Amino acid sequence: MSPLRKTVPEFLAHLKSLPISKIASNDVLTICVGNESADMDSIASAITYSYCQYIYNEGTYSEEKKKGSFIVPIIDIPREDLSLRRDVMYVLEKLKIKEEELFFIEDLKSLKQNVSQGTELNSYLVDNNDTPKNLKNYIDNVVGIIDHHFDLQKHLDAEPRIVKVSGSCSSLVFNYWYEKLQGDREVVMNIAPLLMGAILIDTSNMRRKVEESDKLAIERCQAVLSGAVNEVSAQGLEDSSEFYKEIKSRKNDIKGFSVSDILKKDYKQFNFQGKGHKGLEIGLSSIVKRMSWLFNEHGGEADFVNQCRRFQAERGLDVLVLLTSWRKAGDSHRELVILGDSNVVRELIERVSDKLQLQLFGGNLDGGVAMFKQLNVEATRKQVVPYLEEAYSNLEE
């Protein structure tokens, strides 16, 4: 980078060093946050958006400069949970980003407590198009959105407001800033490992769920990388397939995790509203191993289910859903496990079974825990959540 610019780790370290009076500007504290699963895509999108906005503000891309105005990238988990994301840790190490330079939930709470009275908290949302439930008491205004999930039609006055189909939200974030920063080569080189890591993971190395936005982002990255052999070699990006394999192996490594760790590693929680009855508190955990592996690692089916029920109680959930996925011999496989009140479980499953092509292989609907093979392997949590929400909204009292 030029001597007047900061790299991503330098930018984050600089933010950490500033007093709150310098971070909050004109009685406004601004953050950028992904969704509560805090996966590679959410973390990469939040850091990239905040960093690129800093470069934009400090540069000559617009007459409307906002030097000294910062967006703080927030990772929507406790600091201690970052270690569960071994793929993210690997990519952060590539960029020489230290854990202590990152901002987590604890940091957001501290910032909110220490700003002067009357300071508003504005947020850009990435990999999400509504305020995360756990942050609703902190965020006053949503001022921008870039996301690739189902459009909830909220915060319609946000700017930018980009909600469109994409394999990875990071692709949308990158393309947005690539254009605003006029293809700045230095910036692309600086954020390439973060962006490519997220895009390659979300698209299975550009083989599945690839959209034009993903192709464009990768093409733009590779066009810059191809002219920087030494930098590319230093970052380990000469072979994107090898880079993907390294990340994927770490993402799939959950050996030694407790059941609670596995459930919260990639977790989202929702409140569904139904016809004339109370809301349904539902949590969904995406897991990279099949149920038989989980049983073998954690004392058998009964012990594993008991620990899931404990997690369910601790989170105040009416329903807990586990979505397992893995690949074998080039084929994708999925399972869906649901725990909760037997009547609610039965009603939900009856309404989504055809869409997800569910086949019972364990438990039973009357016992409040049922396990299914999910033959519709294209349906990820991104599709399962709207299916379940629609099913609950149609339940009669």
Curated annotation (Swiss-Prot):
User: A GO molecular function for this record?
Assistant: ATP binding
A family per Pfam: DHHA2
- Which positions bind Mn(2+)? 41, 127, 148
Keywords carried by this UniProt record = ATP-binding, Hydrolase, Magnesium, Manganese, Metal-binding, Nucleotide-binding
Q: Which cofactor does it need?
A: Mn(2+); Mg(2+)
SMART domains assigned to the protein according to its UniProt record, in alphabetical order:
DHHA2
A biological process from GO: polyphosphate catabolic process
Binding positions for Mg(2+)? 41, 127, 148
The record's listing under Gene3D superfamilies reads: DHHA2 domain, inorganic pyrophosphatase (n-terminal core)
One cellular component term from this protein's GO annotations in UniProt: cytoplasm
Q: Which reaction does it catalyse?
A: [phosphate](n) + H2O = [phosphate](n-1) + phosphate + H(+)
* InterPro entries with a match to the protein in the record: DDH_dom, DHH_sf, DHHA2, DHHA2_dom_sf
Q: What is its EC number?
A: 3.6.1.11
- Identify the residues that bind ATP: 149, 286, 381
- UniProt enzyme class: hydrolase
The extra comment attached to this record reads: Present with 3170 molecules/cell in log phase SD medium.
Q: Describe its function.
A: Polyphosphatase (polyPase) involved in the degradation of inorganic polyphosphates (polyP) that is able to degrade a range of chains from three to several hundreds of residues in a highly processive manner. Exclusively shows exopolyphosphatase activity, cleaving inside the polyP chain.
> Family assignment?
Belongs to the PPase class C family.
The name under which this protein is listed is Polyphosphatase
State which gene encodes it. Answer: PPX1
